[in-house]
Curated annotation (Swiss-Prot):
It comes from the Bacteria. Belongs to the TsuA/YedE (TC 9.B.102) family. It holds the Pfam family Sulf_transp. It is found in: Cell inner membrane. Probably part of an operon that comprises bigR, blh, PD_1893 and PD_1894. This is Probable transporter PD_1892.
Length: 135
């Protein structure tokens, strides 16, 4: 399989899982909301299977394609921790995450989600440029 098919397949699977979650569970696939409900003691039967799927998906990929994607992170642990906290803060400020706004919200033609996703992308590009990713 060509390396270009992996992101296409990933997008198809994201779309299918989003539609299935909505049709079978009546909920949208906003990861921050799902994890937030779990942390607040929400119904585990509705939320745990989705989170488990997020963990098992990459493992299943590795087994099926006999390939472990190589990922190199050049950042230090303090940078990673601060980045994670900033993402969490932005998720709360934006009332959702990239999956909720970018996948589900845009598909629903939500103006709030379109604006939030544009801000995510612009912020990501600015941060990557500032951090010297594009040299």
């Amino acid at each position: 399989m060509s390396e270009y098919w992996y992101p296409i397949l990933g997008g198809i699977l994201l779309g299918l899982s989003t539609v299935m979650l909505l049709l079978l569970n009546g909920r949208i696939a906003g990861i921050s909301g799902i994890v937030g409900r779990l942390l607040q003691g929400g119904n585990p039967a509705q939320n745990i299977p989705f989170v488990v799927g997020l963990v098992l998906g990459p493992l299943l990929f590795t087994v099926i394609f006999d390939r472990f994607p190589s990922v190199t992170v050049a950042a230090t642990w303090p940078t990673i921790i601060v980045a994670g906290l900033l993402v969490g803060l932005g998720t709360r400020m934006g009332a959702g995450c990239t999956s909720g706004h970018g996948i589900v919200g845009i598909a629903r033609h939500s103006p709030r989600s379109i604006v939030a996703t544009a801000i995510f992308l612009i912020s990501g590009m600015a941060t990557a440029t500032f951090m010297g990713v594009y040299q």
